[in-house]
Every structure is written in C-alpha cells, then in structure tokens.
Swiss-Prot record:
Gene name of the encoded protein: RpL18A
Domain of life: Eukaryota
Record-given protein name: Large ribosomal subunit protein eL20
GO biological process: cytoplasmic translation
Gene source species: Drosophila melanogaster
Record keywords: Ribonucleoprotein, Ribosomal protein
Record's keyword annotation contains Amino-acid biosynthesis: no
Family, similarity comment: Belongs to the eukaryotic ribosomal protein eL20 family.
Gene Ontology molecular functions: structural constituent of ribosome
GO cellular component, one term: cytosolic large ribosomal subunit
Length: 177
C-alpha cells in the first residue's frame, strides 16, 4: 500500500462464496484506512488471507462504505495500536496523536513511522484506533496541550503602522528577544 494523501476510514464487509458444502458463510467486517476504496478492498483481502483460509477468488465483498467523523470540528486524542515489520523483526507499538479526525491521526501515524522508524506503509498494520479522554493519555507530546492556560510565545513581533514612525534609523528587529 502507498499511503498517499489523507487516509480515509472504510468499513469493508466480505464473506466466502456460499457452496453446497457451506451454504451459509459468516460475514467479516473490518475498519480499513486507505487513500481510496480500491486500496481498501485490496487491504481487506490481504488481511483476510492472513486470518482465514480464503482469498479474493473464493470470496466476495458484500459492502464497502466510507466512515465519516461524527464531530470533525472538535479536537480529540487518539490512541493507535499497531504492528510493523522492521529490518530486525516484527514489533508491537502504541502511539498517541491529537487530531480532528481518525483518518488524520492515522495519516500522522504513517508519516511519523516512516520518519522515525523508516517503516513503509505496506509493513504497518493498524490493530486498533480509539479516542482517548485527556486523563488517560500517556505521551508527553499529547499531554502538554491539555493545560487550559497554555500560552504560545510570539516568535516574530508585528509592528503596527500606527505605532511606527515614517522614517527609521535602522531596520526593525522583529525576532523575539
């Protein structure tokens, strides 16, 4: 899989084709994060082939639909459980991100894993994604934004026209001192 652009969340439901031996086959539902529905179907068959003993030729996709965020204007903390293959083996990992949507948090995770661990998108498997309350977050880079009186330094000051003179002796210093 190539994780290009913002990843979207898809709910894919599939099953093994019914036969005379097994007329009622169970349905399998997965949450897949992919750039489009074609890649989502492909990832669904990839995971199902690993978990159950059938593949695309002996199965069918019953439904595929994109899952939209219920409140995309409220920032949330997301916990992501994943496993990835590195050069030294397979590792389990838990990561936390702050984002507006689940897709945005998972996209951040893929970018972060590529930057920090050189993990390619095809070697990352998302196990579980969950929204976490502020009290249950563990990572410092997420906890630092839970302060209600948080202040950000003004790195570059802006000189307003009303306060400055028409001519100046020197170039204005806008950097933070």
């Amino acid at each position: 899989m190539r994780a290009k652009g913002l990843l979207k969340e898809y709910e894919v439901v599939g099953r093994k084709l019914p036969s005379e031996k097994e007329p009622q086959t169970p349905l399998y539902k997965m949450r897949i994060f992919a750039p489009d529905n074609i890649v989502a179907k492909s990832r669904f068959w990839y995971f199902l082939r690993q978990l159950k003993k059938f593949k695309k030729t002996t199965g069918e996709i019953v439904s595929i639909k994109q899952v939209y965020e219920t409140s995309p204007v409220k920032i949330k903390n997301f916990g992501i459980w994943l496993r990835y293959d590195s050069r030294s083996g397979t590792h389990n990992m838990y990561r936390e991100y702050r984002d507006l949507t689940v897709g945005g948090a998972v996209t951040q995770c893929y970018r972060d894993m590529g930057a920090r661990h050189r993990a390619r998108a095809h070697s990352i498997q998302i196990i579980k994604v969950d929204s976490i309350p502020a009290a249950k977050t563990r990572r410092v880079h997420v906890k630092q934004f839970h302060d209600s009186k948080i202040k950000f330094p003004l790195v570059q000051r802006v000189h307003h026209k009303g306060n400055r003179k028409l001519f100046s002796f020197r170039k204005p210093r806008t950097y933070f001192q």
